[in-house]
């Protein structure tokens, strides 16, 4: 599925990140997409999957200012999170420029990268679970996972 590319940005060939975000948000026919903005990413929830794009920003604590840095950040996210949620994290997918517009996973030049995930039931998010009764075991399990993650974390 493609949509015409517009705007220019040297960091993504000749396609701006704004054009990519517009394409992912609604540039594909017959696909309902919900957009969630965070301070460093934009997540697009489709019926069966989620695509997460890193914002083209440089902050004191992270640098996603180039296409290559965003690709590496997506790959790092997959590496870290696939250990704990292998059934959710699918991989990194390119957003490409094709003759007739933008495509997800196309063969043309890459203009952006996204983390591809399986969309899970929103009733299973921690904020929704926290509005009910949380069992102490959940906290213990979460603490163990976090401790293990810190033990194996790469320090740069």
List PLM regions with ranges.
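Conserved ATP-binding subdomain of kinase catalytic cores across diverse folds
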Residues: 15-156
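Serine/proline-rich low-complexity intrinsically disordered segments, especially terminal tails, linkers
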Residues: 8-9, 43
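Short, surface-exposed ligand-recognition loops at beta-strand->loop->(often short) alpha-helix junctions
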Residues: 12
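N-terminal acidic, proline/glycine-rich, low-complexity intrinsically disordered segments
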Residues: 1-7
